[in-house]
């Protein structure tokens, strides 16, 4: 009987929360509209906030009185007076919150200002709910819990009603999960269209892949199907299918990414909830939703968002497997890792060590059975992850595109070299920075993610993206692991080994990777950090003395890492630092000493609120500017735009043509700067040199137009070709008038804007920036013979071989000897177009190129 009563109260509370949320969502929407209109009408934020709340107060009161608390029979006057007091308290809370948000965000305008107002309004809504339940409608709530009043009309049906024969069982979503998903939806979708094509490199590939199933299957960057993208195709397949369904538009590409971000938040919530409870799950999901780089990547089209989702899903399936020991869950975990491999190759394996160790340690059905189950999961991973590489291997080279990022056209070179060990040991070539559309830089951090070492994740390039609360995750995760004593019977052990293992493996690899490392890579850390923080919160609320110690130490650890990040971000949140120190230390002491669960929970929530202020502010500020370019970053515009500059598609490598012939000086168009020289237009500056137009500045130098700025520098103006593509457009008109055909240029990035704009048949034969791939003369001869390519544009700053590679020099020498040079006057009399480069017509020159390829 008692159990039935408790269950009834739980169902009633769930219905109450659900009803309140529906009414609150409608009132919040009305509030947002009113607030926006009043702000545009010239009112101050405080006045607009007060009037908007007043206008929606009556409707909110009436609806909650009738539907949520079923208190229509109670005295109206007393309830209305109490609600008015609750409203005034909510107004005070929202006004203070709005003032803090406006100060933290630097008094923004436009969409960011509206979002700050809505956030303050939501805070007031939470306060009003608590007051309504505990005071305004207290008698109705007590009567409902005592079983004397019928349930509210808007509450979900009882379990018994849902299970009636002949009806479908309905599981209502948990209110806290709905809140998390709504928050993630706002952060991921708000003003999404301002990001345009985001990374034009991938958007161009999506257009090419959406027009041809051959291009789709073989991951082709260009419409002609000559060169692949330098990443596997899974994330681009999702975007290309969306484009096929809804048309080629920025939102067709970006909305799937935003939905992936929401799904990851939901997965983290459930991953933590299954082991540490709903409050812990909510904290984990909230931390992820408010992580700046997680917000930025959910609003961008780089493949990392799908990678993060799939790796999180692998951990979720592992957690399910640890619960009941079933083989199917561990097989599904292997499938998720395999799909992640098809998204970004070897980096997907970061989660594997933790999963393997957790499964072998816990071994729900014995060690021998665990080994067999791991073999099944590993087979699934290899089968799924190896499917596309096997396809590329078995397809004859002449029937598929050249594999970008390689010099031997081998998918295995891409896997283990450019996208694999080369990123760890520093042997992989690649671009240092690129401009973003609309003059935005590629993202804070520029060439690298800072010096390698244990402090890398807290530096000025990476710390603000995901390093704020690393101390909570580190200390909390370690503390729970010690408390569990790694007992196989303790359900926390396997969970912590899997999740903590994924976190440690990724953090160590990212901290010491010597290769090209960009700030947005740390988005893979975000769900692991969030899950460990959620677990720490749930553990600290358990009431055990060791749990209180872990909670207190975790708060201090979080304070330390956040202060370290703030130290590396001068000028950011100066007002927060003393408040953070005092508040967190007091909170840690109270959590350690308090025995009352409610007191401990309230203080822990307040301390977490302090720790989340800075990252949440950065997450919200990400919505105030375009997240575009090659290297996205979260945070204010001054940080996110702090990388190399560029116009639409601009890239420091120059205009997209090939480098000049052997022997050309660095001052000539298309030449290579000598090792000790200074880069001129199209050249590459040495480590101690300085870059001019189209060059690359050293990591410690300052970039000029198109150069690469240091991590905290401001971007320049971008390379000349990428600015509007007008030079290539003029050449394309000439090509179209003389038989058409594909134009071969150096940089895929430089060709991206033209492909996006018109689907122009232009192929970047040098890879992403023009210096990652070395197509052979023999391959070029075969493409010319088959009619797949006819024209070659040799231009300044083409960049095929920063160090003057033999392959690129030999290729251009062969083109010069075998193909016919087209006078620049033939396609334009303008000096701007004339300097676009030298166009070569290779029609009928396949035999000559073949002869030269054997020399």
Language-model features: locations:
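Alpha-helical transmembrane segments of multipass membrane proteins
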Residues: 27-31, 35, 56, 60, ...
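Transmembrane-lumen/periplasm boundary regions of multi-pass, lipid-linked membrane glycan transferases
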Residues: 199-215, 223, 352-483, 561-569, ...
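Membrane-interface starts of transmembrane alpha-helices
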Residues: 15, 43-55, 108-123, 172-176, ...
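Membrane-embedded alpha-helical segments of integral membrane proteins
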Residues: 133, 329, 333-334, 339-340, ...
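Luminal/periplasmic acceptor-recognition loop/helix of membrane-associated glycosyltransferases
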Residues: 717-752, 758-803
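Membrane-interfacial entry segments at the cytosolic side of transmembrane helices
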Residues: 366-379, 544-551, 573-581, 593-609
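Membrane-integral, polyisoprenol-dependent glycosyltransferases
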Residues: 153-428, 439-548, 557, 621, ...
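Juxtamembrane helix-capping/reentrant segments at transmembrane boundaries
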Residues: 71-90
């Amino acid at each position: 009987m008692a159990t039935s009563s408790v269950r009834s109260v739980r169902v009633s509370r769930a219905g109450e929360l659900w009803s309140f949320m529906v009414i609150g969502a409608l009132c919040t929407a009305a509030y947002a509209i009113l607030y926006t209109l009043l702000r545009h009408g010239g009112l101050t934020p405080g006045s607009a906030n007060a009037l908007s709340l007043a206008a929606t107060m009556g409707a909110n009161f009436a609806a909650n009185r009738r539907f949520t608390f079923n208190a229509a029979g109670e005295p109206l006057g007393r309830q209305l007076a109490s609600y008015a007091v609750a409203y005034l308290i909510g107004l005070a809370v929202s006004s203070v919150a709005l003032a803090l948000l406006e100060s933290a965000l630097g008094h923004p305008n436009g969409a960011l200002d509206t979002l700050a107002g809505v956030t303050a309004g939501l805070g007031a809504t939470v306060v009003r709910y608590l007051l309504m339940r505990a005071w305004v409608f207290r008698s109705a709530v007590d009567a409902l819990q005592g079983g004397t009043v019928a349930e509210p009309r808007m509450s979900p049906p009882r379990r018994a009603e849902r299970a009636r024969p002949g009806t479908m069982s309905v599981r209502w979503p948990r209110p806290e999960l709905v809140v998390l998903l709504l928050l993630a939806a706002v952060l991921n979708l708000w003003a999404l269209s301002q990001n345009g094509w985001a990374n034009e490199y991938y958007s161009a590939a999506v257009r090419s892949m959406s027009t041809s199933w051959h291009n789709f299957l073989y991951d082709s960057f260009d419409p002609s199907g000559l060169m692949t993208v330098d990443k596997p195709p899974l994330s681009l397949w999702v975007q290309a299918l969306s484009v096929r369904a809804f048309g080629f538009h920025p939102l067709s590409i970006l909305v799937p990414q935003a939905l992936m971000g929401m799904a990851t938040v939901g997965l983290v919530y459930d991953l933590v909830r299954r082991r540490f409870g709903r409050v812990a799950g909510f904290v984990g999901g909230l931390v992820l939703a408010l992580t700046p780089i997680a917000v930025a990547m959910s609003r961008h089209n780089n493949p990392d968002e799908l990678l993060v989702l799939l790796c999180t899903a692998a951990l979720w399936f592992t957690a399910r497997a640890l619960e009941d020991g079933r083989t199917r869950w561990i097989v599904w975990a292997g499938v998720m890792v395999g799909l992640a491999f098809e998204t970004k190759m070897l980096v997907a394996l970061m989660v594997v060590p933790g999963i393997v160790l957790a499964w072998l340690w816990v071994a729900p059905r014995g060690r021998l059975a665990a080994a067999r189950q791991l073999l099944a999961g590993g087979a699934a991973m290899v089968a799924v992850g190896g499917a596309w590489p096997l396809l590329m291997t078995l397809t004859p080279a002449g029937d598929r595109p050249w594999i970008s990022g390689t010099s031997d056209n081998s998918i295995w070179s891409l896997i283990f070299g450019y996208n694999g060990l080369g990123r760890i040991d520093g042997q992989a070539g690649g671009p240092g920075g690129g401009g973003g559309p609309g003059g935005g830089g590629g993202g804070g951090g520029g060439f690298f993610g800072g010096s390698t070492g244990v402090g890398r994740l807290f530096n000025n390039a990476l710390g603000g993206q995901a390093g704020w609360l690393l101390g909570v995750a580190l200390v909390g995760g370690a503390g729970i692991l010690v408390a569990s004593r790694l007992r196989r019977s303790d359900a926390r052990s396997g969970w912590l080994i899997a999740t903590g293992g994924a976190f440690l493996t990724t953090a160590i690899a990212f901290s010491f990777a010597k290769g090209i490392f960009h700030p947005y890579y740390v988005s893979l850390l975000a769900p692991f950090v969030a899950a460990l923080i959620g677990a720490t919160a749930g553990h600290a609320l358990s009431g055990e003395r060791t749990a209180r110690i872990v909670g207190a130490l975790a708060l201090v650890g979080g304070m330390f890492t956040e202060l370290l990040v703030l130290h590396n971000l001068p000028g950011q949140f100066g007002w927060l630092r003393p408040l953070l120190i005092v508040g967190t230390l007091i909170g840690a002491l109270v959590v350690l000493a308090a025995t009352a669960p409610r007191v401990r929970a309230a203080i822990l929530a307040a301390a977490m609120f302090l720790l989340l202020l800075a990252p949440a502010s950065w997450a919200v500020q990400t919505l105030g500017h375009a997240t575009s370019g090659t290297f996205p970053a979260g945070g204010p515009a001054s940080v996110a735009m702090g990388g190399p500059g560029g116009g639409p598609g601009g890239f420091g490598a120059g205009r997209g043509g090939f480098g000049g012939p052997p022997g050309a000086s660095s001052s000539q168009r298309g030449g290579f700067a000598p090792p000790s020289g200074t880069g001129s237009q199209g050249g590459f500056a040495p480590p101690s040199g300085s870059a001019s137009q189209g060059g690359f500045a050293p990591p410690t130098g300052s970039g000029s137009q198109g150069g690469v700025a240091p991590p905290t520098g401001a971007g320049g103006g971008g390379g000349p070709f990428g600015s509007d593509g007008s030079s290539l457009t003029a050449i394309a008109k000439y090509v179209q008038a003389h038989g058409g055909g594909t134009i071969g240029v150096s940089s895929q990035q430089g060709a991206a804007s033209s492909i996006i704009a018109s689907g122009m048949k232009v192929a970047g034969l040098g890879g992403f920036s023009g210096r990652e791939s070395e197509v052979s003369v023999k391959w070029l001869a075969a493409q010319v013979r088959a009619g797949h390519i006819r024209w070659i544009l040799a231009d300044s700053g083409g960049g095929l071989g920063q160090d003057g590679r033999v392959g690129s020099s030999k290729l251009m020498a062969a083109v010069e000897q075998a193909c016919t040079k087209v006078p620049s006057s033939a396609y334009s009399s303008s000096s701007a177009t004339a300097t676009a480069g030298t166009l070569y017509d290779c029609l009928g020159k396949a035999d000559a190129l073949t002869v030269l390829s054997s020399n």
